[in-house]
Amino acid sequence: MPSKDAAIVNKLGLHARASAKLTQVAGRFQSNVWLSRNDRRVNAKSIMGVMMLAAGKGTTVLVEAEGPDAEAALAAILQLIADKFGEGE
């Protein structure tokens, strides 16, 4: 199962709009996608789960994917995070 740590770099962290974008991207893939922070692991396709991580700017999350398109799912989520969820800040 591919996985990688990613730092949340956008100004507002995983707020509602960023969480919605992340769940939309995760939902495009057949694979299961999870985000973990500290001891909490959530389904990246669940907006409530993603928001419950309370991941602010500078927080590191572990992104994991398992399934037929796991590598592509992981790459897409990591790219979204690196692009600051399209927010520019």
Describe the function of each predicted region.
Residues 9-57, 82, 88:
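Compact, glycine-rich, soluble single-domain proteins
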Residues 1-10:
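Short amphipathic
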Residues 4, 33, 59-61:
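Conserved beta-strand core positions
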Residues 56-89:
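C-terminal structural segments of small proteins and small subunits
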